[in-house]
Amino acid sequence: MLKAVILIGGPQKGTRFRPLSFEVPKPLFPVAGVPMVQHHIEACSKVPNLKEILLIGFYQPNEALNSFLLKAQQEFKVAIRYLQEYSALGTGGGIYHFRDQILSGGPQAFFVMNADVCSEFPLVSMLDFHKQHGGSQSYVILGTTANRTQSLNYGCIVANRDTQEVLHYVEKPGTFVSDIINCGIYLFSPSIFQHIAEVFQQNQQELQLEENSSWQRMEVIRLEQDVFSTLAGRGKLYVYKTEGCWSQIKSAGSAIYASRLYLSQYGTTHPERLASTKEGGPTIRGNVYIHPTANVDPSAVLGPNVSIGMGVTVAAGVRIRESIILHGAVLQDHSCVLNTIVGWDSMVGRWARVEGTPSDPNPNDPYSKIDSETLFRDGKLTPSITILGCNVSIPAEVVILNSIVLPHKELSRSFKNQIIL
Ligand code: GTP
């Protein structure tokens, strides 16, 4: 029997995802038409004998999360539970705190996945690899190759070329260490908890020496820095390298990039989710997802890489490219939306142009992963995608370029390179 844990973080996390994470917990933000973590859950549901998925985070349980989990449970026919940490315990502290729940029923192994990654989730291949590399006494990290500069933003892995044993692990190194990076997807045998316990005991000893140390601080454990770094070179930690697509979803810009990856996967995994040009329907270019309840005028042109949410209205002559349009939004006649996320219930007026600058990886470099982009560099706003928060209104005939508009704003003129509060 197997299980899976998805680390979903909490409200103080995902700051680079604002203002979109004000409205919906980031793990539920739609990527290629479905909530970000649904992609993880679906991948888990295809692993034979995977009996339970545990989401661990520090969000207060809420209506959106509960109803999503209920629906996903029914759709994917797997037990799913949310376990709430009393505060942020780190990527290792949460699983250690809930170790009894994870181990109940006696799983032979369990996956742990960061919620904010986009992947093909080669979980079955990871299982096979795990069996061939130590089984019950070993742990597997999914790795991929990045270019030298970008590797510095990730956990870097030095591995034995023949055995794939992890010899050295450094999280976000200051100088180049390795081009193999940690994808935030792991397969652990239950014995991993002995190693996390060592870190916990060490924290306890160190903190006992300090006055006013709290129980909570002892429980904060980072899998990457505290556990992987010490396990490396001890014949227990292995890297399974994937050639499949992978990216992180840190900023809103990277959500558009991740949408593109998932939409292209739909070609093989979910062709029914991809729209096509049909008699009497809009013109579709490349991969486009349209929610069945959306109302799209036949003269609109959509794509590539467009996701249209529930109840969205796309009027006559509208052009949309490389964008995510969230539920309830209205794009009026002849408006143009490029490299933008249009927030829930927002309105783009007639002939308005809303445009951002993509923050894609270098298209000529296959090993270039999307970076955690910075909004400001040298005190200046760097060109980014445009984001309209929830319930924003853009008047007719204006241009909004590389800007972020906070929720509930009614604009009256054009803006360029601004955060509109
Ligand atoms: P940054 O670039 O600083 O964001 O680092 P990172 O990519 O290593 O990400 P981080 O470790 O912050 O988060 C990785 C994943 O774990 C994300 O999906 C987070 O939501 C989740 N996560 C981070 N901290 C916690 C925590 O304290 N508890 C839980 N349950 N999840 C967490």
UniProtKB/Swiss-Prot annotation:
KW Nucleotide-binding (keyword) present: yes
Pathway: Nucleotide-sugar biosynthesis; GDP-alpha-D-mannose biosynthesis; GDP-alpha-D-mannose from alpha-D-mannose 1-phosphate (GTP route): step 1/1
Gene giving rise to this polypeptide: gmppa-a
Protein name: Mannose-1-phosphate guanyltransferase alpha-A
BP term (GO), one: GDP-mannose biosynthetic process
Disulfide bond residue pairs: none
Organism (species): Xenopus laevis
GO cellular component, one term: cytoplasm
Catalytic activity: alpha-D-mannose 1-phosphate + GTP + H(+) = GDP-alpha-D-mannose + diphosphate
GO molecular function: GTP binding; mannose-1-phosphate guanylyltransferase (GTP) activity
EC number: 2.7.7.13
Homology family: Belongs to the transferase hexapeptide repeat family.
Keyword annotations of the record: GTP-binding, Nucleotide-binding, Nucleotidyltransferase, Transferase
